[in-house]
Amino acid sequence: LAGESEEHQRLTELFQHRYGGTGALAGHAVGNLVFTGLWELTGDPIEALDAVGSILGVAGRVLPMSPVALDIAAEVVGLESDPRVVRTIIGQVAVATTPGSVRRVRLIPEDPPAAAGVVEAVDSADVVVLGPGSWFTSVIPNVLVPEIAAALARTPATKVLVLNLAPQPGETAGFSSEQHLHVLRQHAPQIDVDVIL
């Protein structure tokens, strides 16, 4: 959402800032905390996203992928002396900041419903853009919602995959565009991409 705002550059930078250090907020993005606070105040994730969009002066609209609270679980290698050992890490921040290499992710709970309006937005779109963003914690989770994956598979819209300019340690370090597609196929084999940027 913060990436959509041109007029409010300083706010955009603030929303994208991740806290450093080792405290309770370490690794958390300011924007996610603001969104969570607004969600608690309004009781509605869509209303909270609309409020964040208004704060940032965004012209478009962002919808949550699901109306239920979700967590991310990742299969990670490279955390033990034996590189074949796979450990499960749970939580967006833990996955995004792991010193290991993420191999696969899943949602908790699995098979959540899509949020109101998301499937309709995909069905009526001319172009659907996947990314940019944290590959395993922002992009892939969207295709793990069954209704969204089905909508992305059937839509006649052009599907554009936008890769990050720089790799993310633990998530996409050393990934080629082909590896990104391979991981997408592992998680959502029914989705074809038309363009990669």
Residue ranges and their predicted role:
Residues 196:
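Extended, charge-enriched "interface" segments that sit outside catalytic cores
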Residues 104:
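Adenine nucleotide phosphate-binding catalytic loops in nucleotide-utilizing enzymes
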Residues 1, 97-99, 108-115, 121-123, ...:
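Conserved phosphate- and dinucleotide-binding cores of soluble alpha/beta proteins
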Residues 131-134:
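Glycine-rich beta-strand-to-loop/alpha-helix junction loops that act as flexible
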Residues 1-100:
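Electropositive, gly/pro-rich neighborhoods at or near active sites that engage anionic ligands
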Residues 48, 52, 62, 66, ...:
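General "foldedness" signal
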